[in-house]
């Protein structure tokens, strides 16, 4: 049977009370963007669900485009029929015939919110179940663990039937929680942090520090490609590429070796915070994981964070490396991240960096250099690009220009 719509269930959005409307509106905008090259599609949002009216569009194409959209708990290809029992029976039989396998099992799960329909939910289950059993010989009922679950939703505007539920990306719609700057290196952790921030509704803009000739064009391109992977979940990621060579060279010359990494991170954070201010961001996201490296001890974080009062979101802070790697593999950033190109966090790394730097000493070391002027110069030369979905993202080839 040909499906005429996709039924979208909100999940967590249902708990948002008075703010629900703005979350649903944002989700509808994100869905519309994902379907932008399907002009026949229409989106209809309601308080507890959303419909995508296909108007002849390929439902499988719509499925693929819904899968990475945060804010969707689950969705189902569905059909709508009139409030007529014979039409419901015909649609139910057609759906189960298409979905069942030989010697399979099924159940009917009906819900009636339109009280004028002549049968209640239990009666619908019995009537439709009996009709299906009479017409499909090798099918039996299993109410606990069926192979096919036929859902029937009787509403004032019609009866909606579906046989399959696909899990969505869950979370909150990207953009519903505001904007933040993601400190995107070429490593494993920061893309995962960006993904998790997006899942909580944050619109991210990536900030990447580029230090030629110490870092290569391949390292820069790797970061752009990683941003492309993250764009899969939002449609597009703005990326700010910061020239960082001069600052790193001055740090190497003027700052004691043991705290080079601490001062470097402080300068990165200052620049990121200024970009956040210019771009009306509300927070900074990074991939710090507690205790993983010298700059990620609590003492180091305290010394680094002292340059800003802006909230720092660390989605992976309590994760083991293996947990982070699992997510990186899931979102298809791992193979990119392990490409052997140095980024600015790995150059000039001292053999024995301090794990417990003292803030007063750090500030004393910095006081002999006019870092303000260097930061201003770097900001004046930032390159900003719009990054779309990565061409090699793990989605079907025909969907590569999805957003």
Curated annotation (Swiss-Prot):
Its recorded name reads Probable tRNA sulfurtransferase
State if Plastid is listed as a keyword: no
Family the UniProt entry places it in: Belongs to the ThiI family.
Q: What is the lineage of its organism?
A: Bacteria, Bacillati, Bacillota, Bacilli, Bacillales
Report the catalytic activity.
[ThiI sulfur-carrier protein]-S-sulfanyl-L-cysteine + a uridine in tRNA + 2 reduced [2Fe-2S]-[ferredoxin] + ATP + H(+) = [ThiI sulfur-carrier protein]-L-cysteine + a 4-thiouridine in tRNA + 2 oxidized [2Fe-2S]-[ferredoxin] + AMP + diphosphate; [ThiS sulfur-carrier protein]-C-terminal Gly-Gly-AMP + S-sulfanyl-L-cysteinyl-[cysteine desulfurase] + AH2 = [ThiS sulfur-carrier protein]-C-terminal-Gly-aminoethanethioate + L-cysteinyl-[cysteine desulfurase] + A + AMP + 2 H(+)
Q: Which Gene Ontology molecular function entries are recorded, alphabetically?
A: ATP binding; CCA tRNA nucleotidyltransferase activity; tRNA binding; tRNA-uracil-4 sulfurtransferase activity
Q: Where in the cell is it found?
A: Cytoplasm
One Gene Ontology biological process: thiamine diphosphate biosynthetic process
Q: In which pathway does it act?
A: Cofactor biosynthesis; thiamine diphosphate biosynthesis
**From what superkingdom does this record's organism come?**
Bacteria
InterPro entries hit by this protein: Rossmann-like_a/b/a_fold (IPR014729), ThiI_AANH (IPR020536), ThiI_fer (IPR054173), ThiI_N (IPR049961), THUMP_dom (IPR004114), THUMP_ThiI (IPR049962), tRNA_STrfase (IPR003720), tRNA_sulfurtransferase_ThiI (IPR050102)
Q: What PANTHER family does this protein's entry cite?
A: TRNA SULFURTRANSFERASE (PTHR43209:SF1)
| Domain THUMP residues, every copy | 60-165
């Amino acid at each position: 049977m040909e499906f005429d719509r996709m039924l979208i269930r909100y999940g967590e959005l249902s708990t948002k009370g008075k703010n629900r409307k703005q979350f649903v509106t944002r989700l509808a905008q994100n869905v519309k963007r994902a379907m932008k090259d399907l002009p026949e599609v229409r989106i209809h949002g309601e308080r507890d669900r959303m419909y995508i009216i296909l108007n002849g569009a390929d439902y499988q194409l719509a499925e693929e485009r819904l899968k990475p959209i945060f804010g969707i708990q689950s969705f189902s290809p569905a059909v709508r029929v009139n409030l007529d029992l014979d039409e419901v029976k015909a649609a139910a039989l057609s759906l189960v015939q298409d979905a069942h396998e030989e010697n399979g099992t099924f159940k009917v799960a009906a819900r009636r919110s339109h009280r004028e329909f002549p049968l209640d939910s239990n009666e619908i289950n019995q009537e439709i179940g009996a009709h299906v059993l009479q017409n499909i010989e090798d099918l039996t009922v299993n109410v606990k663990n069926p192979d096919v679950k036929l859902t029937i939703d009787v509403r004032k505007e019609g009866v909606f039937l579906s046989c399959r539920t696909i899990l969505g990306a869950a979370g909150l719609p990207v953009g519903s929680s505001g904007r933040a700057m993601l400190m995107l290196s070429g490593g494993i952790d920061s893309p995962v942090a960006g993904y998790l921030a997006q899942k909580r509704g944050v619109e991210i803009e990536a900030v990447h520090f580029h230090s030629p000739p110490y870092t290569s064009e391949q390292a820069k391109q790797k970061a752009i490609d990683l941003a492309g992977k993250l764009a899969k979940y939002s449609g597009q990621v703005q990326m700010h590429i910061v020239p960082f060579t001069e600052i790193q060279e001055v740090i190497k010359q003027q700052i004691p070796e043991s705290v080079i990494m601490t001062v470097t991170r402080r300068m990165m954070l200052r620049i990121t915070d200024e970009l956040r201010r210019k771009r009306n961001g509300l927070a900074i996201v990074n991939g710090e994981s507690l205790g993983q490296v010298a700059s990620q001890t609590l003492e180091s974080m305290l010394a680094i964070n002292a340059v800003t009062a802006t909230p720092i979101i660390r989605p992976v802070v309590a994760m083991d490396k293996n947990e982070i790697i699992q997510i990186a593999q899931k979102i298809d950033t791992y193979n990119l991240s392990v490409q052997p190109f140095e980024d600015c966090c790995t150059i000039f790394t001292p053999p024995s960096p301090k794990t417990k730097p003292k803030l007063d000493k750090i500030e004393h070391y910095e006081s002999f250099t006019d870092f303000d002027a260097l930061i201003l110069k770097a900001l004046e030369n930032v390159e900003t690009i719009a990054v779309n979905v990565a061409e090699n993202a793990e989605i079907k080839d025909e969907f590569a220009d999805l957003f």
